[in-house]
A protein has these predicted regions:
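Residues forming the flavin
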Residues: 2-51, 55-146, 150-167, 171-221, ...
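Short Gly/Ser/Thr- and charged-rich N-terminal loops/segments
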Residues: 224-228, 232
Length: 556
């Protein structure tokens, strides 16, 4: 017999399956042999903290090994090909969905596989430099593989988020992510899951090419209107029939390959060379809002005390505390982003002359610090205020009427370079005590930090653009009043957080998912401006795969 129950219980009863079973026996008189947690969330609004659970209790029978039907893949070795550029979550989920639909994915990834990539990340601290093709942004798994593995998304409108979580579980993630209100795999476990997804792609006839960088799209300018799928958008007789790519051999880009087929473009939000190529080729893009700011790091026990209303912090039974903060300052949103409880701050640059920070947490979330991005909203209409960040010469000559829409990208680059200069041209990060940042003074010394390459004292309040620093300072003051102890000299402001999302959107039709002027090109995921995190990128990847399948299978 299976009982489904809604429980509101103390943390010590909700700690694990055995403690829940003990609670059911002692408090409910249900002699369950096993339980399945369907939903789990923590209510810490009052001093007495409760855990809300929806559980299935199994009495006299065993629970199934998987709580969903596993997804079935079939051999596609001899099926028509679709090129997937990028092996982040958008690209990987697109590839798996293509296999389900009977098409062969050819995945082209500029970076290395997830194991080799980890070695390059480890070299950042001792060498104080970043490999431009293998870093926290580029490589198998994309930016999400080594930046926390959070699977929480507010978007429920664009696709089936449960499918994404189930596919992760099928490839080795814990089934707990199906129940948690804020599911999280962890940077220590997600790479193995990503590797298993690649193995599935290869096992069923797909291809994966690492250290292979797209350098151009192959465009057929002949008319498409004589046959095939009727065009509902202005493709001007142009369609994508493949890509040109170069292969890295012995540390040099040398061998040039062509891959033929329609293209799912899932290159991520840091592939700036792709944005410039599209603009120079007259392939329409437009400005998109994003947010820029800093990473704020507190001692984890302090955040636990604040969020759990208890001097003892989280104690034995609770996880490291999370927070989510948002306010408006002079008409623009200021908010926390990618909060990493019990985590650490990492160097997230993807090229030379850059210092960028991000955050991550291992699955246990048991580190000494907790950190979060603290960012200020920038809207497309704010672009005129950024006129002191001129475009590079290469953009002045581009054919696209949207060339000005690369201006926010230039703002990112200029701020990242300024951060690098402040860091003495190394991967150390400019930093300031939180109270000094708010008061407008240089810190005489700095707190300990999880940031491995090291910190250097810097007046971020001075060199950050005023429309960012002023809003952050006002928000910090407000949140310090709302959460006693939050505004403290024990916290550290670390620069700079610029990679919250893509600075542009690659324009596509909402129904066909194809670019508005070129058939056979499917802009996808966070880099194209249609997702914001692992799960939403995975959902968008699946939608693009379905659209690409419709396009391929309907053509003569």
């Amino acid at each position: 017999m299976v009982h489904e129950l809604n429980l509101r219980i103390l943390p010590q009863w909700a700690y694990n399956e055995q403690s829940i079973i003990a609670y059911l026996r002692q408090e409910k008189g249900i002699n369950a042999g096993a339980v399945r947690v369907l939903r789990r969330s923590i209510d810490a609004r009052q001093r007495t903290i409760y855990v809300n659970l929806t559980v299935q209790a199994y009495v006299g029978e065993e629970p199934p090994q998987l709580y969903f039907e596993p997804y079935i893949y079939k051999d596609v070795s001899d099926r028509p090909s679709v090129i997937v550029v990028g092996a982040g979550p958008g690209g990987l989920f697109a590839a798996l969905r293509l296999i389900e639909l009977g098409l062969k994915p050819i995945v082209v990834e500029r970076g290395k596989d997830v194991r080799e990539r980890k070695k390059d990340l480890a070299r950042i601290r001792p060498e104080q430099r970043v490999d431009p093709e293998s870093n926290y942004s580029f490589g198998e798994g994309g930016a999400g593989a080594y930046s926390d593995g959070k699977l929480y998304t507010r978007s429920k409108k664009r696709g089936n988020t449960d499918r994404i979580l189930q596919i992760f579980v099928q490839h080795g993630a814990s089934q707990a992510i199906l129940a948690d209100a804020h599911p999280h795999i962890g940077t220590d476990r997600l790479p193995r899951v990503i590797e298993n997804m690649r193995k599935t792609i290869l096992a069923y006839g797909g291809e994966v090419h690492f250290q292979t960088k797209m350098t151009g799209l192959i465009i057929d300018h002949s008319s498409l209107r004589s046959g095939g799928t009727p065009l509902t958008i202005d493709h001007c007789g142009k369609r994508i029939i493949g890509i040109v790519a170069k292969k890295m051999v012995n540390g040099q880009w040398s061998i040039v390959n062509e891959f033929k087929g329609p293209v799912i473009l899932a290159t991520g939000h840091s592939a700036r060379d792709v944005y410039r190529y599209l603009a120079a080729s007259g392939i329409d893009i437009e400005a998109k809002g994003l947010a820029i700011g800093v990473r704020l790091e507190h001692p984890a026990h302090l955040i636990d005390q604040i969020q759990y209303h208890c001097r003892e912090g989280r104690g034995r039974w609770l996880p490291a505390a999370e927070y989510s903060l948002v306010t408006q300052v002079q008409g623009r949103g200021v908010y926390s982003f990618c909060m990493c409880p019990g985590g650490f701050v990492v160097p997230a640059a993807s090229g030379p002359e850059q210092v960028v920070v991000n955050g991550m947490s291992p699955s246990g979330r048991n580190g000494r610090w907790s950190n979060s991005g603290m960012v200020v909203e920038i809207r497309p209409e704010d672009l005129q205020a950024l006129s002191n960040f001129p475009s590079k010469g290469e953009e002045k000559d581009c054919k696209s009427p949207f060339k000005e829409d690369l201006r926010v990208l230039r703002l990112q680059e200029e701020l990242e370079r300024q951060c690098w200069l402040q860091a003495n041209r190394l991967q150390t990060a400019p930093a300031q005590r939180m109270t000094d940042f708010v008061s407008g003074r240089l810190s005489a010394d700095l707190n300990e930090s999880s940031y491995a390459p090291g910190l250097i004292a810097s007046p971020l309040h001075f060199w950050l653009p005023d429309f960012i620093s002023m809003r952050l300072r006002e928000a910090f003051k407000l949140w310090g009043k709302q959460k006693r102890g939050f505004l403290t000299s024990e916290a550290t402001v670390i620069g700079i957080e610029t990679r919250t999302s893509s600075p542009v959107r690659i324009l596509r039709d909402s129904e066909t998912m194809q670019h508005i002027r070129i058939a056979g090109l499917f802009p996808c995921g966070e880099g194209a401006g249609y997702a914001g995190g692992i799960v939403s990128a995975g959902v968008d990847g699946e939608r693009c795969a379905e659209a690409a399948a419709t396009y391929v299978l309907s053509r003569p």
